[in-house]
Swiss-Prot record:
Belongs to the phosphatidylserine decarboxylase family. PSD-A subfamily. It is a peripheral membrane protein. It holds the Pfam family PS_Dcarbxylase. The modification Pyruvic acid (Ser) is found at residue 183. Its main location: membrane. Its EC number is 4.1.1.65. This is Phosphatidylserine decarboxylase proenzyme. It comes from Neisseria meningitidis serogroup C / serotype 2a (strain ATCC 700532 / DSM 15464 / FAM18). It catalyses: a 1,2-diacyl-sn-glycero-3-phospho-L-serine + H(+) = a 1,2-diacyl-sn-glycero-3-phosphoethanolamine + CO2. Pathway: Phospholipid metabolism; phosphatidylethanolamine biosynthesis; phosphatidylethanolamine from CDP-diacylglycerol: step 2/2. It comes from the Bacteria. The gene is psd. The keyword S-adenosyl-L-methionine does not apply.
Amino acid sequence: MNRLYPHPIIAREGWPIIGGGLALSLLVSMCCGWWSLPFWVFTVFALQFFRDPAREIPQNPEAVLSPVDGRIVVVECARDPYRDVDALKISIFMNVFNVHSQKSPADCTVTKVVYNKGKFVNADLDKASTENERNAVLATTASGREITFVQVAGLVARRILCYTQAGAKLSRGERYGFIRFGSRVDMYLPVDAQAQVVIGDKVTGVSTVLARLPLTAPQIESEPESEPALQTAPVETAANPSAEQRQIEAAAAKIQAAVQDVLKD
């Protein structure tokens, strides 16, 4: 059970809307009969939109869970704009029929929350990640890995709700936010994370594993030390080459003289 939200069936953000729709539908039914049908349709739609069912949560410590229901629209290597590092980016688009409650993808500690004002273009488009209103949660997992998950407003969604803050500890599957009426969530994971989904896959919040993230970062191999240069033994040369040459010439002269003496005899 989520410690921040003990009623998992209907999201608390929908209680005023559902309650108002139900009261209005009953009132119109008593006064106008069948003319109340549109009000009942709206109330039923609100019930399904704000549903927030409990889900089974995988406990593999390497599993990064989908924070929301939806469809995968991006799986690529990209730049995490909040940490300025290369990352594996996975984006999930939510239509109005998906559960819009956002939950933590891993056991983590929130290090920073960054809110950016922006536009409200279709959240299915890539430019929504950089142009739309968005709220980023930067966190460090229990094993020390850094991840970023971003709530992105959509064409209809006009309000991002985030209930966490720097220093807060989130358990995997714990509810931390909500976006109304169609939106998107961008995930930025370390580059050594292994994606478990592809574009077009439909995912279920906290039940689908988006990626597997090793508990420790890969070790950067250091360059091998260069071998010391072999020292060449110095070549000894004659201390006085001219004197040696004179000795050779003198010996040659003696030999020549001896040969001449032999020939004379």
